[in-house]
Structures are given as C-alpha cells and as structure tokens.
Design a protein with these regions (language model features):
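Ligand-binding loop in jelly-roll beta-barrel domains
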Residues: 104-105, 115, 140, 147-149, ...
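Short, conserved beta-strand element in jelly-roll/cupin
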Residues: 126-140
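Conserved short histidine dyad/triad with adjacent acidic residue
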Residues: 108-126, 160-161
C-alpha cells in the first residue's frame, strides 16, 4: 500500500514498499475561462561560463486543442542524444510529437475533460515509446481487447500499440507525457 505525504505546496513524497518517488501535488488553479489547469513551465541550463541560467519561467506559450483535449507542449529535442547546454526555448516552437519525420523527444501535458464534455478520441497507434504519469483525475486506457483504469499517481509505458483514452468521470484528467521516437522493428520487417 502506498503512502503519500505533502512535503510542499508543489510536491508530494509517495512511498510504496522500498520504492519512493516525488509526484506533483497539482494545485488545480484554473485558467481565466475556468476550463483548464494553469501550468507553470521553468527551463534552466548553463551559460558559456557554466553558471545556471533560467531560459523560461511562466505559462506554456504553445497550447493547442485537439478533439476537445488541451495539449500544452512544454519542450522538444531533435535527435538523440539531446544537445546541452540549452540555448533557446524549444518549448515555444515544439510541434506535434507524432508528426511524420520527427526524431527526438517531446514533453507535454494533456488535459482530457470528463463526463459530457469528453469527446471521442479515435483508436490510434504511434511509432513512439511514451512514458506517462497521471497527475490528477482518472482515465480509461483502452486497448482493442481490454481496458485499464488509471488514476492520479499511476504511470504507464506505452510501446507503439493501438489504444485510445476515455474519461467517463466528471473530473478532467491531467496526464504528463514524455514521448521518444522509436525504431519500429515490426513496421520495418
């Protein structure tokens, strides 16, 4: 059984047996229209003298709505390994992580509304390795032959299979994604 203690306004320490992790304590502050969670994005790196610098600190400037889902694109890197130091704000120009020809990583937050506001997200498959954490709410991760209910604190590693998302609950589900383009051996065989 896991146990979580609030250690600050922005984080919680959760432990399950021997494993511990820090999960965000989502404040759930809403945007001015009341629909979405207000997010803060901080980006740091080093200057040419090796001193820490803040490249960005504020709300994400790259937000889109797709099928009723709000996607806040926080960062992307082209190619692997990523290049350091960071010199420009790659979050402002981050595109769709699933676009043809993109190779690299993408970091974003998706908000999927629940209840009657929940749109149908079609079954789809991406050629990516996706790491996800559910920050708030509940969501059904639907595979062609089964459904897995995920809730705040759950994580998922999704490896290029057919899936969709369904939010049957009243609360908006807040998901954090790190997407890595993958070499799909099945497609190239």
């Amino acid at each position: 059984m896991s146990r979580c203690d609030k250690i600050s306004r922005r984080a919680m320490l959760c432990s399950a047996g021997a494993a511990s992790f820090v999960a965000p304590a989502v404040a759930r502050e809403r945007t001015t229209d009341g629909r979405w969670t207000r997010l803060r994005r901080v980006v740091t790196s080093e200057d040419s003298n090796g001193r820490p610098v803040v490249i960005a600190d504020g709300e994400p400037g790259n937000v889109v709505e797709l099928n009723g889902t709000r996607i806040s694109r926080l960062w992307e890197s082209s190619g692997l390994p990523a290049r350091l130091p960071l010199v420009t704000d790659a979050g402002v120009s981050a595109g769709n992580a699933y676009r043809p020809g993109f190779a690299g990583t993408s970091f974003y937050v998706a908000e999927i509304p629940g209840g009657k506001r929940a749109p149908a997200i079609p079954m789809h498959r991406n050629t990516t390795l996706d790491y996800m954490a559910i920050l708030a709410g509940k969501i059904a991760f639907v595979l062609p032959d089964r459904e897995i209910v995920l809730q705040a604190g759950d994580t998922l590693v999704q490896g290029g299979n057919h899936h969709t998302w369904v939010n049957r609950w009243s609360e908006t589900c807040l998901l954090l994604f790190v997407v890595v383009t993958a070499d799909d051996q099945k497609s190239s065989a």
